[in-house]
Amino acid sequence: MTDAADLPYRRNVGAMLFNAQGRILIGRRTDQPGAGGPLDGGVWQCPQGGIDADEDPEEAVLRELREEIGTDRAVIMGARPDWLTYDLPAALIGRALGGRYRGQTQKWFALRFTGQDSDIRLDDQQPPEFDAWQWIDLPSLPERNVGFKRDIYRTLVRDFARFSQPA
């Protein structure tokens, strides 16, 4: 068994993508069907992903949008000044995130979606990260995710509420 204390945190970026109505995009993960996501089955989350070596977080968040939802139609409106960190539950240590990390430390960005819904293409990446997506109201975000990430999402709802006003 892997001891979590011996593992590092994975550096990661998260994208809270707001549409013109002030709603945010979430996607249903393809790799975790029925994993305890509270609504509609599966796990729903904002686009996010690892930061490549020699990549700055701003570049990484735009790359993740291209990879996960197939669009570059977004502009960065703001970012959290600090990083948010979560630990994986004990049952996932040594299994999730390639078994190499105890959790993630995340730099989160608020972005404005500048395209049309038809610009979102989940099949640009193979295998796709998400099999469905939807726009939701910001306050409902924490309850749409797995329990061990809810505190991060509650913090983001509070900190990014100013971006949820219609454009």
Swiss-Prot record:
Report the residue ranges where the short sequence motif Nudix box is annotated in this entry.
49-70
Q: Which GO terms of type biological process are on file?
A: nucleoside phosphate metabolic process; ribose phosphate metabolic process
**Which UniProt keyword terms apply here?**
Hydrolase
Query: Which Pfam family, giving just one, matches this sequence?
Result: NUDIX
Nudix hydrolase domain boundaries: 8-158
Q: What domain of life does the UniProt record list for this protein's source?
A: Bacteria
GO MF terms listed in the record are: bis(5'-adenosyl)-pentaphosphatase activity; guanosine-3',5'-bis(diphosphate) 3'-diphosphatase activity
User: Which coenzyme or cofactor does it need?
Assistant: a divalent metal cation
Q: What is its EC number?
A: 3.6.1.-
Transmembrane regions: none
Asked if the keyword Hydrolase belongs to this entry, the reply reads yes
Principal EC category: hydrolase
Q: What does this protein do?
A: Accelerates the degradation of transcripts by removing pyrophosphate from the 5'-end of triphosphorylated RNA, leading to a more labile monophosphorylated state that can stimulate subsequent ribonuclease cleavage.
Family indicated by similarity: Belongs to the Nudix hydrolase family. RppH subfamily.
NCBIfam families recorded? PRK00714.1-5
Q: What is this protein called?
A: RNA pyrophosphohydrolase
Native organism is Gluconacetobacter diazotrophicus (strain ATCC 49037 / DSM 5601 / CCUG 37298 / CIP 103539 / LMG 7603 / PAl5)
